[in-house]
């Protein structure tokens, strides 16, 4: 028996106390497991007998039967919603409004940033910045969304005078890897740490004597084991992932921190180069 429907249809016939009970049940249907008739009566300022009579008016033997039936209806309704609403990304479904989607995305990205920053080993980060600053040549590797993060970092490093490459073609990435030398740095960006193309490039770079720095997740992976240094990223994305949104947010926070750290290491000259770069681009407008 669909008691929620019966309550909705019988509203015009309810007395004042019955309307109070109906409103309470509908507003708190998800919390009814912890609600007793005594607790409800006290909260609404009515007698327990009024609640029992309300349940009987709807066709139940008493409040316990009505409460259990409402809990069952609510659970069934939730299951149906979850089954019919398409998961678009993480916790976002096709039933969400744009406002809800915006809040969920914002929170997901905030959590990725907070958790990634909480994991930073700043002494290790400083050492990595020093290693990169001394590298004659820097190669950045990545696939998909990680490649976008890598390309952004490569542009930033070029702007402050570093010799750096970030090729999209995996064959070219492998070719560049085998040309690296001792003192060069390869920055490998892969959240999973298991992409065969990235792992191969890291293997080759290490054999050539280059220093491998991995920006990856905490999960044990081939890339993590190969790297001389790791920078850890955390993402709260689930299996329902349409794009690596919070992963890129976490990765960008790491690469931006690397960039600012490198600027700080040679601040006067770096700022001059950034200014010259800005002046050149202004001339193209």
Curated annotation (Swiss-Prot):
It comes from the Bacteria. CDD domains: SIS_RpiR. Pathway: Amino-sugar metabolism; N-acetylmuramate degradation [regulation]. One of its GO terms (molecular function) is DNA binding. Residues 37-56 bind DNA. Keywords: Carbohydrate metabolism, DNA-binding, Repressor, Transcription, Transcription regulation. One of its GO terms (biological process) is carbohydrate derivative metabolic process. Pfam families: HTH_6 (PF01418), SIS (PF01380). Residues 1-77 form the HTH rpiR-type domain. Homotetramer. Represses the expression of the murPQ operon involved in the uptake and degradation of N-acetylmuramic acid (MurNAc). Binds to two adjacent inverted repeats within the operator region. MurNAc 6-phosphate, the substrate of MurQ, is the specific inducer that weakens binding of MurR to the operator. This is HTH-type transcriptional regulator MurR. The lineage of its organism: Bacteria, Pseudomonadati, Pseudomonadota, Gammaproteobacteria, Enterobacterales.
